[in-house]
Amino acid sequence: MAQTTKLTYQPNVLPADTLTGDKVVNHQKEDLGKIEHLMIDLANGRIAYAVLSFGGFLGMGDKLFAIPWSALKVDTVEKQFILNVDKEVLKSAPGFDKDHWPNMADLNWANGVFKFYNTKPYWD
């Protein structure tokens, strides 16, 4: 009699606040900043963006970037995220400061962000 192995799905579910503050690096292991916020699409029940804080010094002058969640890969060993973008390219990415957030419900803005990171919008 053949023995079968039952595969068990183990969801990767974590509290959102455990991800804020996590480091983001690129494939060259350059530090790109840290995750400040997770933006939730309430209508679709999913994370739309991770807000990345980059640049500045001791939290002053940081620029914020909305990174499509699908553009980030999890490195569970190092407890960090990997974003496939060169550090110099990130400097020219569409960003904002902590006092002037974009309208993330604006589809023109959102499409531009997903295009910049070469990621297909999840609503398409």
Regions found by a protein language model. Name each.
Residues M1-D124:
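Peripheral interaction segments used for macromolecular assembly
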